[in-house]
Structures are given as C-alpha cells and as structure tokens.
Design a protein with these regions (language model features):
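Tubulin/FtsZ superfamily GTPase core signature
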Residues: 1-174
Length: 174
C-alpha cells in the first residue's frame, strides 16, 4: 500500500494536481549526519530537513546578489533537496534520483567574504561548470548571509517517477 501511494503521489505531481512532490530518504539524511543518538534521532533528521527547506524557501523569495535561479520546467515536478560542501563541491541530495533534469544551487556566503574575497566568484563559477553535465539544466544564486560559515543548498528536479529501493531490488533480481 505504501509503495502504491509513493507512486501515486508522484503521478499526481507530474499531472499538475500537486505543484511539486518532494522526496526525502531518512537513511540518506542519517548517513549525511553521521552518528545520531537514539534519544534525538528523529529530531536530528527533522532539523536538517526543515532547516534546508527553510533556507531554500528564504532564498527563493530573495533576489540573489549574482545569478538566477530558474523555475523548473513544467514536466519537472518531482524534487529533492540537499546540501553541498563549499570547499569540495561534494553534493548530498536527500533522495537518490534515477534521472536528474534540473538543479538549482543556493550559495549562502558570509557577507564580509563577499566583499573581500576576489577569487570567490571564480571558485563558484568553476563549481557550477563542473555540475553542467549529462543534459542537466543548472542554475545558481549567490546570497549574502551573516553566518560565519558558508553553505550551499541545492534542489534537484526530475520528471521520472522514482521507484522505492525495494522495487528496484526486485526488478534487478528478475
């Protein structure tokens, strides 16, 4: 029953009944966070998911200093969120899509760093160029923050209904 609902909700999004269906895999979020105490397990998972959604929502309603976040194509209504390392560019999406059509990167950069680091734009453009592959449409925005650390939040979109992991295993064994 859960599998059916998982697929049906994605089909509803694809048909336009829902604007977007967001997929998150708790195991992937757990692996990203590392060791989480049992007592705070769900709080830890929910904190990173909610804060990532919150920051993306803030940036989607804020004009970027540089860059443009493109609206996804009409057919790309299944999405996930994630974070990336500013230093390495390594990306951690909260759901493993089979086929990514579009990605948006939200660079949350310390305001003082934006005003003083002359090599910053080159580093960001290099990271963005490295993400442009396999016919994936990529957009980005750079946003000033008062945070001490720099963050990259990301959103990935697909038009393909995603199978649950158990279904994929069954198909591979057939």
């Amino acid at each position: 029953q859960e599998r059916a609902i998982f697929g049906i909700l994605q089909q509803y999004a694809r048909s336009g009944l829902f604007e977007t269906a967001y997929l998150v895999d708790n195991m992937i979020v757990e692996n990203f966070l590392g060791d989480i105490p049992v007592a705070g397990y769900y709080d830890g998972l929910n904190d990173i998911i909610v804060s990532t959604f919150h920051m993306i929502n803030v940036f989607e309603n804020t004009e970027p200093l540089i860059g443009t976040i493109q609206k996804p194509q009409e057919s790309s209504r299944i999405a996930t969120i994630g974070v990336a390392s500013f230093e390495s560019g390594e990306e951690n999406l909260f759901y493993p899509f089979d086929l990514v059509r579009e990605k948006a990167y939200y660079y949350a950069i310390n305001k003082e760093k934006l005003e003083s680091d002359g090599s910053l734009i080159k580093k960001i453009k290099t990271q963005i160029k490295s993400k442009m592959q396999d016919n994936v449409r990529v957009s980005y925005g750079i946003f000033p923050t008062n945070y001490e650390d720099d963050y990259i939040f990301c959103k990935a979109y697909t038009s393909k209904v995603q199978l649950e992991k158990e279904e994929e295993k069954e198909e591979n064994n057939s």
